[in-house]
């Protein structure tokens, strides 16, 4: 409990900008499924029911808020649930980057992550053929490592 309180207080001060943006996004998504994932607030939103301008949000972290888009029809599928858990761990790693970089997070992590995401998914077949994983570069590789390390720690 103390760990979560410290995490939230740092996110709301040092990571204020991205946490405020995350809170706004959470409110814009409306009534969706919210829960704590470790210390962060995770929103699993149904991509078919959110407002049009939010449909392409994908999976993203903003401060202490994690957003994962999923089609409601696929929500109970075990393979998809396992993949969502892996994505949640990765996105949780981004929340640790927020703790480290604070007000510079959006410049150091957010912008490069967005550019890499757009580039990777526009050339996915080419990168896959060359054996290049989405998670092979900064900041994605670091986020995955942080998410894995956080998952190994005792609660």
Regions found by a protein language model. Give the residues of each.
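Alpha-helical hydrophobic/aromatic positions enriched in membrane-embedded helices and signal peptides
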Residues: 56, 82-86, 105
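Metalloprotease/metallohydrolase-associated module, dominated by Zn2+-dependent proteases
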Residues: 2-55, 61, 66-70, 106-155
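A short, terminal or domain-edge coil/loop segment
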Residues: 1-2, 94
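Short pre-active-site segment immediately N-terminal to the catalytic Zn-binding motif
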Residues: 67-89, 134
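Active-site recognition of the HExxH zinc-binding catalytic motif
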Residues: 86-98
